[in-house]
């Protein structure tokens, strides 16, 4: 299953202009390409390295973010160190504003501090993991309840789960 459609619908409904979807590293290019396609947005990629565990360094942006609204998309936000560095890199490259989206908000350790330092307008996540107390105001949580309900109903009624996702439940 994927929350891609919940997240992209949310961003479509926001009506943001001049969007560029930004992959935080090479491992997320396919996900971000699909996300960008659903929004009719451009795609940019960050060159990220991890010199040590929980340490992210981003060298440069591949693609044009100048004057655009960037949406950084990942599957998980854990300590938010990658998100903080990615946001700063994209803003330094001239992005007008930065948003972020992820399915799973682990948000461990100093994640809330990293988010506060990231300069992100809004972080959109799903309710697959409850947020701990003190979550920043710029985090928006979307429900996966309908997606799960429809998937379970399809399984028990012997219908295709792929239909719940319009036949696009495979990202790769």
Give, region by region, the residue ranges found by the protein language model.
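PRPP-associated nucleotide enzymes
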Residues: 1-172
